[in-house]
Amino acid sequence: KLLTDILAGVLEMHSKSAPKYGSEKSGAPTNFYITLSPDPIKITNAELEDVEVVISPDHRSFIHTNPLRGLAAGGTFILQSSATPEEVWAELPPQARKTIREKKINFLVIDAFAVAKKHAPTPELATRMMGIAFIGAVAGHVQQVSAGASAKAILEKMRKQIAKKFGSKGAAVVEGNMEVIREGIEATHKVDYTAAAFTKIDAKPAAIALRNVSLSASMCQTSGSSGCGGMFDREYF
């Protein structure tokens, strides 16, 4: 929701957003759809089938779903990972690599977890901070958003929206969020799968992954005061 509000303000567009939850209560995969348009958006709560940008905060998402499904040719895929671009590419299923190459997808990785952990004053705010790091990744590296604008111009627009959202909480809160956005931009790396190193990875036998949704569910605690405190488990990310 925060990403929707910030991007709509930066781009000066109309917006709609809607979550889609699984039937399970804890640890279930969740999709969140965002639509931005210069014209009023008539549809509501729509499950989008064709999209231009996909953000996956779960680096194991390929184990239990296909985050590339519906991503348009030339679109952008942003994946949470603490690994190097080469390591990330090596862990992808062969079919995912094939899809990314054929559709010429702009593939980016960011360790939003590390950025969030560094700045979050409490575990309860860590999830929000992780989302703000992704805002930096989108604003700084997605062509539909940056539209060739300079980093300075983008950050100035972002600051206005952050001040609008959090200004009542004080200048320190605004600056703290801006620092996360700046680091989110800097922590985002392009996966240059056209390079020779990635071609060599493709030639190696693919690793066999165990398809078990519990791998993603394991990042949420089943007890305790914070239902998603386990999300910030370095062993998971």
Q: What function would you assign to each model-found segment?
A:
Residues 1-233:
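Active-site cofactor/cluster-binding pocket
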